[in-house]
Amino acid sequence: LYHKAPIMIANQVVESLQDNEMFESVEAVMPGFINIKLNSEFVAKYLNDMKEADKYGCENKAPETIVIDYGGANVAKPLHVGHLRSAVIGESVKRIERFMGNKVISDVHLGDWGLQMGLIITELECRKPDLVYFDESYTGEYPEEAPFTISELEEIYPCASAKSKVDEEFKEKAHQATLKLQSGYAPYTAIWKHIMKVSVEDLKKNYGNLNVDFDLWKGESDAQPY
């Protein structure tokens, strides 16, 4: 079957579907696509049967516990259309599974670890070298307020990323900052917490506008202890 031209395979599929009441028309077109038009009467009856059935035709079975990881936003970066797509699809799947009686645990699973954090820290030091986080002699408490807004943060990362592609010294400093953060260096951990707080607050607002919510706000950093 597979050692043939795509249009020949498409024609064979079309031939096998010709008498199926589900379709009003099925045709093969070059170079091997199949155009299908559903039978409106079949669709109407199918949907009406679902409407009349208990739970829209969902099977009655023992409830399961399901974990759905969707969202996948990166902290310090704005959401893009790919994040919106996965959020809407994941939220839909979550609601359907709950409607079916299953226990569903949703997790946003943030991209909150790795080199992107080192890039932000290094760029922040370039811009604001007088911050206490970069004073090795500082032994006091770190500020509760973040030294940046979400707008500044979303501008810092792409700038740092672009700089790392042309400045080897900057890139190496970012790698070292990443290593220090992941080794538990207190000043960088404090900056990371600021990044998380500012970013997550903004993400919750944006996801809320989509009526998307998560039970868990875990991220890549949660695997660090393991």
Where are these regions (language model features)?
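NTP-dependent nucleotidyl-transfer catalytic core
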Residues: 1-226
